C-alpha cells in the first residue's frame, strides 16, 4: 500500500496541474492586459490604484503556480530546499497581499458611501498609494519572519516559542483581514438595501461585489487549508490532499477571474463591436449611476472616438 500511494497521488495531481496551466495562461493574459491599461492608458483614482496592485499580485501569484505546475508536468528536479522555502514564501506574500488589497478596496468603498463628505473633502490625496506600499511591505515582512523562525532556521535556533508567536500573529492577521472584508461588505449591502436613502447601483459597486464573492468561493479555501497547516504539523491523508489540490485550483481560478469580471461588467448592455478593451475596463470601474441620459452620452462619446 505504501508503494502504490505515491503513484496514485501523482496521477491525482496530474489533472489539477493541467487545470492550473490552462487557467494560469488565461489569468496571466487577462491580468497583463489589466496591468497595461491601468498602468499606462487610464487615469488612476483611489480605487484604480488598489485594483492595479491587486492585478499585480494576481499576476505574480498565477506565475508562481504556473511555474510550479510546469515543473511538475515536465518533471524538472527541484534545485534544493532553499528554493522550495523561497518559492512557498513568495506565494504566501502574494496571497496575503491579494486579500489585503480586497479588504482595502471594500473598506475604501464603505468609507466613500458611509462618510461621503469626509471621504471627498478631507481624505488625504495619496492614501491609496501609501496603503498599497504598506500592504506590500507588511506582507513581505510577516511571511519572511514566519519562514525564518519556523521552517528555515527554526530547528537550528530552537526558537519554538518565537515560531509559535509568529504563527499566531500570521493566523490573527489572516482572521483580521477576513473580518474586515466581511464587515465592510455587509455594511455596503446594508446601506444598499436598508438605508434611508438607498444607494444606487454603479458598475464599480457591482465589480467590487463580484470580486469579493469570487474570492469567498474560490480564494478562501486555500487560505483555510494554509491556516490549518500553520497549526497542524502532521501529514495530510489522501482525502485531505485531494481537497488541498482542489483548493489550489480554486485559488488559481480566483486570480484569473477578476479580468473576466471586469470584461463582463464593463460590456454589459453595451455593444462589444464598438468597444475597445480600454473602454470596457473604464466602464467596469465607473462610479456613477447609469441613467438613460448617461448611457446616451457615453454612446455619443464612444461614437466620436
UniProtKB/Swiss-Prot annotation:
Q: What does the tissue specificity note say?
A: Expressed in a subset of sensory neurons that includes nociceptors. Expressed in the subclass of non-peptidergic sensory neurons that are IB4(+) and VR1(-).
The intrachain disulfides are none
Query: Where in this chain does the entry annotate a coiled-coil region?
Result: none
- State the organism of origin: Mus musculus (Mouse)
Pfam families annotated for this entry? 7tm_1 (PF00001)
- Where found in the cell? Cell membrane
Ranges annotated as spanning the membrane: 18-38, 47-67, 82-102, 130-150, 168-188, 212-232, 245-265
Q: What is the protein's name according to its record?
A: Mas-related G-protein coupled receptor member A7
Amino acid at each position: 500500500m505504501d508503494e502504490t500511494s505515491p503513484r496514485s497521488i501523482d496521477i491525482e495531481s496530474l489533472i489539477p496541474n493541467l487545470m492550473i496551466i490552462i487557467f494560469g495562461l488565461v489569468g496571466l493574459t487577462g491580468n497583463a492586459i489589466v496591468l497595461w491599461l491601468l498602468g499606462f492608458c487610464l487615469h488612476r483614482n483611489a480605487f484604480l490604484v488598489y485594483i492595479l496592485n491587486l492585478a499585480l499580485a494576481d499576476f505574480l501569484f498565477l506565475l508562481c503556480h504556473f511555474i510550479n505546475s510546469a515543473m511538475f508536468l515536465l518533471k524538472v528536479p527541484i534545485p534544493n530546499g532553499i528554493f522550495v522555502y523561497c518559492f512557498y514564501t513568495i506565494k504566501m506574500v502574494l496571497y496575503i497581499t491579494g486579500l489585503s488589497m480586497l479588504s482595502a478596496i471594500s473598506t475604501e468603498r464603505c468609507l466613500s458611501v458611509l462618510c461621503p463628505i469626509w471621504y471627498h473633502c478631507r481624505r488625504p490625496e495619496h492614501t491609496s498609494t501609501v496603503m498599497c506600499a504598506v500592504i506590500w511591505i507588511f506582507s513581505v515582512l510577516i511571511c519572511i519572519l514566519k519562514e525564518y523562525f519556523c521552517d528555515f532556521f527554526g530547528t537550528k535556533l530552537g526558537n519554538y516559542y518565537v515560531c509559535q508567536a509568529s504563527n499566531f500573529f500570521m493566523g490573527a492577521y489572516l482572521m483580521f483581514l477576513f473580518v474586515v472584508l466581511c464587515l465592510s461588505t455587509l455594511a455596503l449591502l446594508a446601506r444598499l438595501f436598508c438605508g434611508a436613502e438607498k444607494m444606487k447601483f454603479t458598475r464599480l459597486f457591482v465589480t467590487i461585489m463580484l470580486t469579493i464573492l469570487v474570492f469567498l468561493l474560490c480564494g478562501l479555501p486555500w487560505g483555510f487549508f494554509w491556516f490549518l497547516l500553520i497549526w497542524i504539523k502532521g501529514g495530510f491523508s489522501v482525502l485531505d490532499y485531494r481537497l488541498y489540490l482542489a483548493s489550489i485550483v480554486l485559488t488559481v481560478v480566483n486570480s484569473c477571474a477578476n479580468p473576466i469580471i471586469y470584461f463582463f461588467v464593463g460590456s454589459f448592455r453595451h455593444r462589444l463591436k464598438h468597444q475597445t478593451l480600454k473602454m470596457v475596463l473604464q466602464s467596469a470601474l465607473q462610479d456613477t449611476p447609469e441613467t438613460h441620459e448617461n448611457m446616451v452620452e457615453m454612446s455619443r462619446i464612444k461614437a466620436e472616438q
